[in-house]
Amino acid sequence: MRLLGAAAVAALGRGRAPASLGWQRKQVNWKACRWSSSGVIPNEKIRNIGISAHIDSGKTTLTERVLYYTGRIAKMHEVKGKDGVGAVMDSMELERQRGITIQSAATYTMWKDVNINIIDTPGHVDFTIEVERALRVLDGAVLVLCAVGGVQCQTMTVNRQMKRYNVPFLTFINKLDRMGSNPARALQQMRSKLNHNAAFMQIPIGLEGDFKGIIDLIEERAIYFDGDFGQIVQYGEIPAELRAAAADHRQELIECVANSDEQLGEMFLEEKIPSISDLKLAIRRATLKRSFTPVFLGSALKNKGVQPLLDAVLEYLPNPSEVQNYAILNKEDDSKEKTKILMNSNRDNSHPFVGLAFKLEVGRFGQLTYVRSYQGELKKGDTIYNTRTGKKVRLQRLARMHADMMEDVEKAYAGDICALFGIDCASGDTFTDKANSGLSMESIHVPDPVISIAMKPSNKNDLEKFSKGIGRFTREDPTFKVHFDTENKETIISGMGELHLEIYAQRLEREYGCPCITGKPKVAFRETITAPVPFDFTHKRQSGGAGQYGKVIGVLEPLDPEDYTKLEFSDETFGSNIPKQFVPAVEKGFLDACEKGPLSGHKLSGLRFVLQDGAHHMVDSNEISFIRAGEGALKQALANATLCILEPIMAVEVVAPNEFQGQVIAGINRRHGVITGQDGVEDYFTLYADVPLNDMFGYSTELRSCTEGKGEYTMEYGRYQPCLPSTQEDVINKYLEATGQLPVKKGKAKN
């Protein structure tokens, strides 16, 4: 056997403890990181990666191992803080207590002289915006799957997000040491559920309690991980009983890559045997095109398979120069046609600086803004401009972050991720070093909130702390919305799920000393129409002197079901009956009037306002006239329309032991769920269903009760659809009671 890590063995031989060895290696690499960050590292020596997965797949544990093996930390800690410390990447006290990652912690490290920027992202669906932000600014990703759970609910969400931002990724099937681990099933699910051309790069030597190591199918050798912390990597011959399986899997790998890479495909057709370098280059090309997904294996908790994964990040994921990033040039004439400009990835100051603020955070260092640099050079002391607000900012400090610790740097170049201090901006803002450049990076996709609760401080004297905390959270998280309900005199907070809002309530108490009282959760219902309805509305007001006059004619149309959350405005006018400068006023009136629907007081959506004709007055017509005309036209159309209420439908995934299958299905049916699929492994089954969010409250308690605490579930927002007649009637009656109105007339609502 050829042995790597001779220095480690020598150190152990001299009686040095593994922890001290880790400390020594940490010192060396820490200096390497500092030295590298101050010099201009070439693009080839940089990787910007994210680690994403379903909740509890082992992302944070994997990141902790990566930081240990690369010398960034001296000791490894367990995620749930059983040792009183908690994982390094879980820097918030709440994260260490719960054992889930809430915010994406950013860090950087070195592996084989390559600088790796890592974002560790939350797996819980309520924190999806963190994953969106991470993937928007990264060049590659590692998707972590659980060998037992396989492809789960949040895995599909992350997969969609990676597709949206065209992020190449590797897959790491984790937890091969667990009972019921089945990497072959996970691979099959990747192919069937995610529709990926995926193949094993490694196969395991044993599974569950017998998991000893892995076989590298490219190099055709066995890899073992020795030492107390798996820090000694040994290479050896493939065990005799696994040689046939290894040969079969290697052939399958070559076929999968040949199907997606032209050069290897030609070699395959000519029956040439590809060399190791041929195969690696083909895998790299196919991975960068997202036409092939390499699959790696291991167990982060048992310290197996992490170092080969790090090698693969260097080998197969892109450097900043291999990814095309575009900025949008916003023209002054406000035309809808946008010009895309390709960013230059050269790590010098030959091009103007362009960067995207993708995360805001208020920590012990003050207001932090995480920025991904896409072009040019950024120096401490530079003046940069926010293209959205036009404000200029002078950089006092520039830093690189390691979870909640930081390191000052003098410069940052294209491809770097850094933190700025004291910058007034919002998530998604673009910064340049030239005023009025008109450039902006494509904005981060922000999903609409689906749940709301009323919240107020327990103590009236804490109002200042409450508003300060709420203000900070809304700046940090675009999916956390706040508004004041003037009718009920309540502060309403909205977010992506119960856990999302619960976490913020707890953070107010912990970080601001402001315990809060929360009301019952309220679902974000919407109202829409079921068929097109015409309108012909004239707004006229005469009160002496110049009056107001605006006439609009057109039709209000329902949008397709997939666009139920949108509002559209279409100008189909000809001539000058409505002067073009007044058309935006009609649109504003329409959008303002959609804030509150007539049936239940919820927002109107899924509508298209088609403006076809109208009239104006030479003296009395002005902007406010057509705003009022737009509002009146919508109200007139709604009075003649058949309305229905839309509700959010959640994609629910339940995992429980087989003996409780009947109770679980009955529970989902009781909650008006539609079962969309089933899966099973060993003694557990997985149920997939679409369930109205309004019917999911209290489900965690019911599931624990009917499965003796052995069942668990996850859910994510799926779509909006018309709610059941009974639900619609209930929602309308509650609104009428709350507003003191008379009962609604029969036939007003669609039953």
From Swiss-Prot:
First-listed, main subcellular location of the protein, grouped into a coarse class: mitochondrion
Pathway assignment: Protein biosynthesis; polypeptide chain elongation
Sorted UniProt keywords: Acetylation, Elongation factor, GTP-binding, Hydrolase, Mitochondrion, Nucleotide-binding, Phosphoprotein, Protein biosynthesis, Transit peptide
Coiled coil ranges: none
Phosphoserine, modified sites: S91
Residues at which GTP binds: 53-60, 120-124, 174-177
Cleaved signal peptide residues: none
EC number: 3.6.5.-
Transit peptide, from-to: 1-36
Cellular compartment(s): Mitochondrion
Catalytic activity: GTP + H2O = GDP + phosphate + H(+)
Record GO terms (molecular function): GTP binding; GTPase activity; translation elongation factor activity
GO terms under cellular component: mitochondrion
Root EC class: hydrolase
Residue span, tr-type G domain: 44-321
PANTHER family with a match to the protein in the record: ELONGATION FACTOR G, MITOCHONDRIAL
UniProt record similarity statement: Belongs to the TRAFAC class translation factor GTPase superfamily. Classic translation factor GTPase family. EF-G/EF-2 subfamily.
Name recorded for this polypeptide: Elongation factor G, mitochondrial
Gene name tied to this protein: GFM1
